[in-house]
A protein has these predicted regions:
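Short, positively charged
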Residues: 1-7, 80-83
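Histidine-rich, glycine-flanked metal-binding segment
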Residues: 2-3, 11-55
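A short, amphipathic beta-strand motif
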Residues: 9-11, 133
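Metal-associated gating/positioning segment near the N- to mid-region
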Residues: 52-118
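Short acidic, glycine/serine/threonine-rich loops at helix termini
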Residues: 69-73, 125-130
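Solvent-exposed loop/turn segments at secondary-structure junctions
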Residues: 120-122
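Conserved small/polar residues in nucleotide/adenosyl-binding loops
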Residues: 133-140
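Cationic, low-complexity basic patches in intrinsically disordered or flexible, solvent-exposed regions
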Residues: 143
Length: 144
């Protein structure tokens, strides 16, 4: 995977109190360096973010994404099991549709990680897995 450098973006992160202008070097899909005046390999893709703001991926800590039957209908809804107020045996991982278009919608909006699960209507609704919003076509909910 070729390197990518984001130049001159106004960076917001969890470390600094104030946003600051800097470059971000990405290598092998990970942040390799952040700082001013970074240089990248000759084959690196360069993205000029001058005048743009750069944020880390957002985390949605409580959602039903992938479980709500989006695009399928009611039969695809795998949350809020209404047969009991106590449903600790429910596992969201068993009901997540990895091809749910709302995963791509969330990713485009900057959400990179979600905690999705059943049971907002239940006192104890089941387990919530934490997963990324990116998937390839061949992957399953177990690969999230």
């Amino acid at each position: 995977m070729a390197a990518t450098i984001i130049k001159n973006g106004l960076i917001h992160d969890a470390v600094h109190r104030e946003a600051y202008v800097a470059d971000i070097l990405l290598a092998d899909g990970k942040i390799a360096a952040i700082g001013g005046g970074l240089t990248a390999p000759a084959d690196a893709a360069v993205f000029d973010a001058d005048g743009l703001e750069v944020y880390p991926g957002f985390v949605d800590a409580h959602t039903h994404i992938g479980l709500d039957g989006y695009g399928i209908g009611y039969e695809g809804c795998d949350y809020n099991e209404m047969n009991d107020i106590w449903t600790p045996q429910l596992r969201a991982i068993d009901g997540i549709n990895p091809r749910d278009p709302s995963l791509a919608d969330a990713r485009r909006a900057g959400v990179t990680c979600v905690c999705t699960g059943p049971g907002s209507a239940n006192v104890l609704g089941g387990t919530f897995p934490v997963s990324y919003t990116h998937l390839r076509a061949h992957e399953t909910s177990q690969d999230l």
